[in-house]
Every structure is written in structure tokens, then in C-alpha cells.
A protein has these predicted regions:
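N- or domain-start disorder-to-order transition segments that initiate the globular core
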Residues: 1-16
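Short alpha-helix boundary/capping motifs
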Residues: 2-3, 37, 101
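Short hydrophobic/aromatic-rich motifs at helix boundaries and adjacent loops
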Residues: 13-17, 78-81
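Short, hydrophobic/glycine-enriched beta-strand segments
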Residues: 18-22
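Glycine-rich nucleotide/cofactor/substrate-binding loop typically near the N-terminus or early
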Residues: 24, 29-31, 36-92
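Active-site mouth loops of central-metabolism enzymes
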Residues: 93-98
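Internal active-site segments that recognize and position negatively charged phosphoryl groups
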Residues: 101-108
Length: 108
């Protein structure tokens, strides 16, 4: 399984700085657009204000992404074909190249 880390998350992990994993189904399935984008960006901003690097996690085209760019957050927030991916669906999501928001179980 390939995992893609954002530059910010990767740099923080290398430097030993704190990183906080955030699930993304609240963005993809839990809130209406555009409230979901606003919520996600605000949550990440609060993390940074506290000295923690946010690592929102989602699956894009079968690839696990740890730390999302704003465009990726907007994509899972708006795209009706975005799947809800729990730990149970991770293998299928990767094999079928799904894009999806991750539940807490898949995020962990």
C-alpha cells in the first residue's frame, strides 16, 4: 500500500514535531458544502495555532494521502462520488482506485 505524505506532514515527522491525524468523513459525508470545507480548514488552523501539524487523511484514486492540500479538501467536500472508507473498505478502495473520506477506523 502506497502512502503519500504532504510536504508539511513529512517534514514534521522527520523533525520529530507533533502531528495530529484527522479523519475526513466529516468533510465528505458529515456536513453540507460549503460548511464542510470551512470546518476542515478551521480545524486545521486550530491545530497549527496549538503547534501541531494537522494530517487530514483521505484516499485519492486508490492512494492513501496523509495531509491534504486545500484543493483535495474541496474535492472530497464537493464530489458526490466520494466514498466513505472505513478500515473494512481500505483494501477495496486501493484495488478499485476509489477516492474517499476516511472514518476514524481507517484513519488510525
Amino acid at each position: 500500500m502506497k502512502i503519500r505524505f504532504s510536504t508539511e506532514v513529512e517534514s514534521s515527522l522527520i523533525a520529530g514535531k507533533p502531528v495530529l491525524a484527522l479523519e475526513s468523513t466529516i468533510i465528505s459525508h458529515g456536513m453540507p458544502h460549503p460548511d464542510n470545507v470551512e470546518f476542515a480548514l478551521k480545524a486545521e488552523s486550530i491545530c497549527r495555532q496549538q503547534g501541531v501539524v494537522p494530517a487530514t487523511i483521505a484516499v485519492f484514486n486508490g492512494e492513501c494521502c496523509v495531509g491534504l492540500e486545500k484543493a483535495q479538501i474541496e474535492s472530497i467536500a464537493k464530489d458526490a462520488s466520494t466514498k466513505k472508507v472505513s478500515r473494512r473498505e481500505l483494501g477495496i478502495a486501493i484495488a478499485k482506485r476509489w477516492s474517499g473520506g476516511t472514518t476514524v477506523s481507517a484513519t488510525m
